[in-house]
């Protein structure tokens, strides 16, 4: 659904695959859609780095020939406190941005906010969402026959659930309403914490 939706929200407790699934989406998207720009943000850079570390320390090392193939697609990686970026041979990249006023100026086709409930709503609306200016410009748009097939930018929100009094609950309700509207490409998924307990993940 991350591929199909322009607005995606995943609410789940610890151990339910938020980081794994989003990192996997980022890799697949960057490989299949050249020159994709993905910005990852969270309340702290350490938390945002987890998505990139899942790629560099897990996907690129622990899956045999699959990891070999992935390493061939990636030309550069750097995941540190001040700089975190993964660059692909086809011009795509994933980088971590600061979720504050100092993070202004970045540009992206996909905005991924991990643990979004911990990020200030004003920062999301006035800084992070402003990254999504121009959509990806694939070469097929140069052909008049396909010039109308513009891609939409994407927003992805991941978090554990929080109090109903918090603004994130209102955002989740809005996503639920829009999910039911067939003219809009919204998706929201909420998994109960009991799943983590049953599988001994909490």
What are these regions (language model features)?
Residues 1-202:
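Phosphate/NTP-binding elements of NTP-utilizing enzymes
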């Amino acid at each position: 659904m991350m591929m199909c939706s322009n607005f995606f929200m995943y609410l789940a407790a610890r151990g339910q695959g938020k980081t794994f699934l989003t990192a996997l989406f980022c890799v697949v998207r960057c490989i299949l859609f050249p020159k994709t720009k993905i910005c990852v943000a969270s309340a702290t850079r350490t938390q945002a780095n987890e998505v990139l570390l899942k790629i560099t320390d897990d996907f690129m090392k622990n899956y045999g020939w699959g990891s070999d193939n992935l390493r061939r697609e990636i030309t550069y990686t750097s995941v540190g406190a001040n700089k975190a970026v993964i660059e692909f041979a086809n011009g795509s990249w994933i980088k971590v941005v600061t979720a504050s006023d100092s993070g202004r100026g970045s540009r992206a086709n996909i905005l991924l906010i991990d643990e979004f409930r911990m990020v200030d709503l004003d920062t999301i609306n006035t800084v992070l969402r402003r990254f999504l200016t121009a959509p990806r410009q694939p070469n097929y748009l140069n052909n008049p026959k396909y010039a109308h097939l513009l891609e939409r930018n994407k927003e992805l929100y991941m978090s554990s659930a929080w109090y109903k009094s918090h603004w994130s609950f209102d955002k989740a309700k809005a996503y639920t309403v829009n999910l039911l509207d067939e003219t809009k490409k919204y998706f929201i998924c909420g998994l109960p914490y009991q799943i983590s307990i049953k599988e001994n993940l909490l």
